C-alpha cells in the first residue's frame, strides 16, 4: 500500500525472456484507484497496450492522450505544427509526427530521453514498435481481436490470444503459456507457466479484496474507503494494519497490530512524502 495515496498496488511479472539490451519482462500492474478497464480488466495495466487516442471532447484544440510503456499519462496539444507536452512531470517525453517510409502514412514517435527509447505508433494510435539505442527493436502485430504477436529484439515470438478486448493467453516458442480468466471486467485468475494459479477476489466496487497464491493460501485481505484507498489489511498470519486518512492536514496514520505502534506520514500538495513521524516522537524528513 502506498502510504501517501492509500493505493493498493500489485506488480507482477508473467514472462521473462532473454533479450537485448536487457531481459524482456511482460509485466502487469494493479492500482486500486484506477477505474479504467484495460486488456487485463478493471484496475490493471499492461505496458504494451499503450496507445494514442485523440481528445474528441475538446473542440477548441487538437489534443492526443496516451499512457506510455513506462506508465506515465501524457497529453500533447498541436501548436503551429508542433506537439507540445501539456502534462506536468512528463518532460522526459517528446513527440513528433512522421511519415512512414514504406506506407507513407503518419506515425507518432514518442522519445523517452531518460530510457533513450523510441515508441512508434501507427495512424490508428496502436503501438507498433519500441526502438532501443543499439538499433534493436521490439515489435507488435495486431488482428481483429487486438494484439496478436510480440517479436523480441532477438527474434523470439510471443503469440497473444485476445477476445472481446481482453488478453486470454500469451504463449512463447517453447510452449510456455500464461492464461488470464475473467468474470465480466474483473481478472480473477492468472494461470502461470508452471500451471500454478493466482486468484483474485473483488468487493462490490471492483477493488481487490483478497489474493490467493499458487499454493492455495489466501495471504491477504483488503478493506477500502469510498475513494478506493485501503483502510485495513489482514494477513494470513493473523496480524493486520489499519490506515487512517486526514485529507485536510495531509497526514495519514498507519497502525501495525504486530508491534502495536503507529507511523504518521505527512505529504505535500503533489502527494510527495515530506515526513514520517514514529511512535517514539522521532521523525524522518524528505526533500
Report each predicted region and the residues it spans.
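Extended charged/polar low-complexity repeat regions
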Residues: 26, 32, 42-46, 53-287
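Intrinsically disordered, low-complexity segments enriched in small residues
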Residues: 1-40
